[in-house]
Regions:
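N-terminal hydrophobic or amphipathic helices/low-complexity stretches enriched
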Residues: 15-72, 120-121, 126, 339
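Alpha-helical metal-binding/catalytic segments enriched in His/Glu/Asp
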Residues: 116-118, 128-192, 322
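A non-catalytic alpha/beta surface segment that caps or lines the substrate-entry region
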Residues: 47-120
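Extracytoplasmic/secreted proteins, especially bacterial periplasmic and envelope-associated proteins
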Residues: 27, 31-34, 38, 52-64, ...
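Structural recognition of the beta-strand scaffold that forms the well-ordered cores
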Residues: 37-40, 74, 117-119, 129-133, ...
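Second-shell loop/turn segments in exported
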Residues: 20-26, 42-52, 101-107, 146-158, ...
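Metal-dependent peptidase/peptidase-like ectodomains
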Residues: 125, 177, 186-290
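His/Asp/Glu-rich mid-to-C-terminal helical/loop segments that flank catalytic regions of hydrolases
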Residues: 170, 174, 289-347
Length: 347
């Protein structure tokens, strides 16, 4: 018996290490608020692509990815070259922040922007991977010199999405999932989804290996308890995955097409055009009344800053939804490999 005891202990240890890790603690509102407060602070000067504020944001996100447990964290540099053109007459009718941003775009010329990329390695990789992304750039200094507050801080658009991606990465790194999960914070989204296009043009892995991609954008709008709406290509095989994940968390489904007009205005669109199965899921695009109120009052203006009454209830629910989405997508049992269905539209 004494001789068998060491072997028995070794076998028991092996069984213990093979057990799946316990579910991670849920993401809390305070976590998102803390990260948003940093990225949307005046010290980052609105995170306009190609500026010191943007570089500072990229360094901060890279450090947060590393601290979360991601490996292979790097900055993916890409060139942005804008040839000056005459601004359309309609630009005069745009909100001041957006108009000044267009004027700055028109005179900037060439500069270098940076995506932030990191990976949480899978424990049983099968040549397939998951991508979770959000853009971190915004409009920078967007108001005239005579204005008291000149900085477009971009708290909702899109420090909220980046905060969620970081929080998801922190959970995923503890879960021991089968497949690799890549976390991407894109730059120059406001310039025409350029960071997402750069990632698709020079990805750290073959695009065909990506079987599920999730984009988070402008999530701090809706309160908790909102149904889950999904922006995606028609016929995407991910719909059943999202429905199941939402149902497991007690959330209802919003299957109408009210938010279809936003499909081409977010980074997932640029990647979907390259055949990647990309979705954007959550409550913000289920409550168009609240979303349109934000777009009319604070979007692309100095008013988009973190306040004590900034709505983060729905953002927390959406962040936790994405932990569950990644858990399912990165499981070889729960989500077998499949091909993308790159048709334009929404379900």
């Amino acid at each position: 018996m004494k001789r068998l005891l060491p072997l028995l202990l070794l076998l028991l240890a092996g069984c213990a290490t093979s057990r799946p890790p316990p579910p991670p603690p849920p993401i809390a509102e305070a976590e998102l608020r803390t990260t948003i407060a940093v990225l949307a602070s005046d010290g980052f000067e609105g995170r306009m692509a190609g500026t010191p504020g943007s570089d500072k944001a990229a360094a901060y996100i890279a450090e947060r990815f590393r601290a979360a447990g991601a490996q292979d964290v790097s900055l993916q540099a890409f060139k942005v070259d804008r040839t000056p053109t005459s601004l359309p007459a309609v630009s005069a009718k745009l909100p001041a922040g957006q108009r000044l941003f267009m004027e700055e775009m028109n005179k900037r010329g060439a500069f270098t922007a940076h995506n932030v990329v990191g990976r949480v390695r899978g424990r049983a990789p099968d040549g397939r991977a998951i991508v979770v992304m959000a853009h971190y750039d915004h409009l920078g200094i967007c108001a005239p010199e005579t204005t008291a507050d000149r900085i477009c801080n971009g708290a909702v658009d899109n420090a909220s999405g980046v905060a969620a991606v970081i929080a998801v990465a922190e959970r995923v790194a503890t879960m021991g999932l089968d497949r690799d999960v890549w976390f991407v914070a894109t730059d120059a989204e406001e310039w025409g989804l350029l960071g997402a296009k750069a990632f698709a043009a020079s990805p750290p892995l073959p695009l065909g290996q990506i079987i599920a991609g999730f984009n988070l954008d402008t999530i701090a709008v809706a309160p908790k308890g909102m149904p889950v709406a999904m922006l995606a290509a028609k016929g995407t095989p991910l719909e059943s995955l999202v429905r199941a994940a939402a149902a497991s968390m007690g959330r209802t489904w919003d299957g109408d097409d009210e938010a279809a007009g936003f499909l081409q205005r977010q980074d997932g669109w640029a990647l979907a055009q390259r055949g990647m199965p990309m979705i954007m899921a959550g409550g913000s695009f289920s409550d168009l009344k609240r979303l349109n109120a934000f777009l009319a009052a604070a979007y692309h203006s100095p008013a988009d800053e973190l306040r004590s009454d900034t709505e983060l209830g729905g953002a927390v629910e959406d962040a936790n939804l994405h932990v569950e989405l990644v858990r399912r997508a990165a499981s070889r049992t729960l989500l077998p490999s499949f091909g993308a269905v790159p048709q334009v539209g929404r379900r």
